[in-house]
Each structure stands twice: as structure tokens, then as C-alpha cells.
Amino acid sequence: MSEATTTTTTTSAPRPGGRPSGPRPDRGPGGPRKKRPFQRRKVCRFCAEKDTTIDYKDPRTLRYFITERGKIVPRRISGNCSKHQREITEAIKRARNLALLPLAAGHALP
């Protein structure tokens, strides 16, 4: 009684939706990606203008740091330093609790 073993070889066909095997192609017909031009670093406006203060009772100032959807704008976009970003976040949350600022996009601004 000998058992016959059959060996099957599978060809490496690309799976549907998978990445093709082999070396990476070039970046496309346009060639390699171009580098972005140097962008000027944003400066914290509260550090630059010492007379401006962060106050939760001033929704006009805080609206600058809120998106259309009602989310708090991150530091990398607003350009604030970490100290003032924390103060802004705290002030926005306090203003939301007092209904001076909207909680979400569907709520109207006063």
C-alpha cells in the first residue's frame, strides 16, 4: 500500500485588490513628487500680542479657534504655543458649558 502524493504548484497570480508584486513602479507619468515650498512658521498670536487675553466670556475671540463643525482647531493649524492652546481649549470648553459657544455643527452661534 503506497500512497501517491500529488504536488500542486500554484502560480503567484495577483490577488484581486492586492498590491502587484515586483519592484515598485515610478511615481507615475509626472515623475517623482515635488517638494513643497518652505512655509513660514506660524507664530502664537497671544505670545506676539501681549495685551490679548484668553477669556471664556469672549466667544468672538474663541470662534477663531473652532471649525465649522464645532471642533477645536489643533495647534499645528492655529499656530498657538502649547501653553496658550491649553488655555484656549479650557476656555472653549467652559464657554460650551455656559452655552456661549455651540457644542456641535447643528447648533447656531449667538
Curated annotation (Swiss-Prot):
Compositionally biased tracts (Basic residues): 32-41
Highest taxon in the source lineage: Bacteria
Keyword field: Ribonucleoprotein, Ribosomal protein, RNA-binding, rRNA-binding
Annotated Gene Ontology cellular component terms: cytosolic small ribosomal subunit
InterPro entries: Ribosomal_bS18, Ribosomal_bS18_CS, Ribosomal_bS18_sf
Region called Disordered, residue ranges: 1-41
Biased composition (Low complexity): 1-18
A molecular function GO annotation: small ribosomal subunit rRNA binding
BP term (GO), one: translation
Pfam families noted in UniProt: Ribosomal_S18
PANTHER family recorded: 30S RIBOSOMAL PROTEIN S18 (PTHR13479), SMALL RIBOSOMAL SUBUNIT PROTEIN BS18M (PTHR13479:SF40)
Role noted for this protein: Binds as a heterodimer with protein bS6 to the central domain of the 16S rRNA, where it helps stabilize the platform of the 30S subunit.
Similarity comment: family membership: Belongs to the bacterial ribosomal protein bS18 family.
Subunit architecture: Part of the 30S ribosomal subunit. Forms a tight heterodimer with protein bS6.
Name of protein: Small ribosomal subunit protein bS18
Species of provenance: Trichlorobacter lovleyi (strain ATCC BAA-1151 / DSM 17278 / SZ)
Taxonomy of the source species: Bacteria, Pseudomonadati, Thermodesulfobacteriota, Desulfuromonadia, Geobacterales
